[in-house]
Regions:
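Short hydrophobic "helix-edge" motifs at membrane interfaces and signal-peptide entry regions
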Residues: 244-245
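Acidic/histidine-rich, surface-exposed loop or edge segments in extracytoplasmic proteins
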Residues: 17-27
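Acidic/polar-rich alpha-helix caps and helix-coil junctions
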Residues: 1, 5, 25-221, 237, ...
């Protein structure tokens, strides 16, 4: 596993400590299920309202938003509640409720659809959304809450990667790259950040305002749990740390090594003010420093940072993997090396030569680059990798550094 937390029996963590958070009627499970299906319900309402043959540019745009969100939600659910797509197409997945069967499902319930049926719906929705976004002249402007055609390409690239449609995944990733901003530079990545949706590498985000309830609640928000230099759950001991083994595999020449404290609680990416705050809070070794506080203010209690849902860096990694697995491992390796050299580590050399070796090299870069962004677990499922809980920094009856 890539993210580590201390054993903290505090507040809502109690259920997790006693392994009671696995049942259907407990909050962690309910939150995921209800959030996805509530969004699907809303999306179904929009889809049922707008004529799919409309010539109105604004309506095309709004229909594309609903179809994209519905596809995103079902993609999350499909990955969470069944094994990965390939080899499991006929297995039961989640109930598939669309605008076409919503009334029937409300009255009589809805049986689980197969994995294939759910993915067919996901791809159908994304294909329609892409066509609509390509056909409309309405754009989101600078508001990255909304889905642009580049984000739709990115979503479809994710799904195609999971379905092992390598050529299509590469094509969509390249289209997303072509219409998006550039990745963070080494200089930009060399300081705590990842708080502003306006950053050029961000494609899609949850945009937060200071007046939002999630902020005024105080600590019930993303920065509270992920931030090490602001006020929140982390500052009372719920630190988010990196697996020591993964950290040790990051070269010293890679600017991302400073996204976490080392064994001596040092990071080259911190300035004097940030070092003082980390010391004051007592941040343990390997604590994350990737996410800075809102507006860069130390001990910030206004946790109004935006939340990244998609960055262009991911598209480069999808492109490299899809090229390699699609029959061109040397091209995939070159794409990966150029991305890392240009933006993260000028000394990096991708020595992988086979398709699967390049795929593993990409996975390693995904584990580092996208750490804390909600994709690591899905990668483990997609690639059929086990979850290795050794080197997790906690005291265990058996050796942990094997």
């Amino acid at each position: 596993t890539d993210m580590v937390g201390l054993d903290i029996n505090y507040n809502w963590f109690t259920r997790s400590m006693t392994f009671e958070d696995l049942f259907f009627n407990y909050r962690p499970t309910n939150i995921l299920w209800r959030t996805m299906y509530n969004q699907i319900y809303t999306a179904n309402g929009v889809v049922s309202t707008i004529d799919p043959a409309t010539e109105d540019s604004s309506l095309k745009y709004y229909l594309a938003q609903a179809l994209s969100i519905r596809a995103f939600d079902y993609f999350v659910l499909a990955q969470m509640y069944q094994h990965t797509y390939k080899g499991n197409e006929s297995k039961p997945c989640v109930p598939l409720i669309t605008n076409e069967n919503a009334n029937e499902a409300a009255a009589n319930g809805c049986a689980r659809s197969t994995v294939q049926e759910v993915y067919d719906q996901i791809m159908s929705d994304l294909n329609k959304a892409v066509s609509l976004l390509e056909a409309t002249d309405k754009t989101r402007g600078t508001d990255k809450r909304y889905i642009s055609k580049e984000v739709a390409y990115g979503l479809r690239a994710r799904v195609n990667l999971t379905m092992q449609n390598w050529t299509a995944a590469a094509e969509d990733a390249q289209k997303a790259i072509n219409g998006s901003g550039t990745p963070y530079s080494r200089e930009e990545a060399g300081a705590p950040g990842f708080t502003e949706s306006s950053d050029h590498s961000w494609m899609w985000a949850i945009v937060i305002a200071e007046t939002d309830r999630v902020v005024t609640s105080g600590i019930v928000n993303f920065p509270s749990h992920m931030g090490s230099l602001n006020y929140g759950y982390a500052s009372v001991g719920a630190w988010r740390m990196i697996n020591k083994k993964l950290y040790n595999e990051i070269p010293d020449t890679d600017v991302r090594k400073g996204w976490w404290l080392d064994a001596n609680k040092h990071s080259d990416n911190l300035n004097a003010t940030q070092v003082a705050q980390a010391t004051k809070y007592g941040c343990p070794a390997y604590t994350q420093m990737k996410y800075g506080p809102y507006k860069g203010v130390m001990a910030q209690s206004t946790n109004a940072s935006d939340i990244p849902l998609m960055r262009v860096e991911e598209m480069y990694l999808i492109l490299a993997e899809a090229q390699a697995m699609g029959g061109n491992p040397s091209t995939g390796a070159a794409t990966l090396q150029k991305f890392v050299n240009d933006y993260r580590d000028p000394a990096y050399v991708c020595t992988a030569s086979s398709a699967t070796a390049v795929q593993d090299a990409v996975w390693q870069q995904r584990r580092i680059e996208l750490w804390g962004e909600g994709l690591s677990y899905f990668d483990i499922l997609r690639l059929n990798k086990g979850i290795d809980r050794r080197c997790l920094l906690y005291t265990s009856p058996s050796p942990r550094d094997r």
